[in-house]
């Protein structure tokens, strides 16, 4: 399975509660962090939901 490197580039403050919860579910604890995940359909759906807050690189 492919890896995805996700960087949080914008704060979720001021966005819907569900979008903030998605940021936490992806593993971001503080702003401007980087996480690496497997590219599963569930992770891709979360990325699509908050794509305006993220920078995404596929490996």
Swiss-Prot record:
This is Large ribosomal subunit protein uL30. GO terms for molecular function: structural constituent of ribosome. One of its GO terms (cellular component) is cytosolic large ribosomal subunit. SUPFAM superfamilies: Ribosomal protein L30p/L7e (SSF55129). The keyword Ribosomal protein applies. InterPro entries: Ribo_uL30_ferredoxin-like_sf, Ribosomal_uL30_bac-type, Ribosomal_uL30_ferredoxin-like. Belongs to the universal ribosomal protein uL30 family. HAMAP family: Ribosomal_uL30_B. Part of the 50S ribosomal subunit. The lineage of its organism: Bacteria, Pseudomonadati, Spirochaetota, Spirochaetia, Brachyspirales. Signal peptide: none annotated. GO terms for biological process: translation. It holds the Pfam family Ribosomal_L30. Keywords: Ribonucleoprotein, Ribosomal protein.
